[in-house]
């Protein structure tokens, strides 16, 4: 199984990297860009687990290591390979 994990700054947290990217896009005349949030994308391959077990393990990994829950949110998708 493949878990696709997305980690992003919480809405209330200032995102200086996202702001810098948005400013650069504006300077390149992409005026339609309203906002950019910079995050992380991870792929975690799992074996030997049921779908339910995989969801539980990825949730645990995100809460314990992959995301800083004070300043980041996460979501994930589990895909069969």
Please identify what each model-predicted range represents:
Residues 2-41, 48, 52-81:
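Long, contiguous binding/interaction regions
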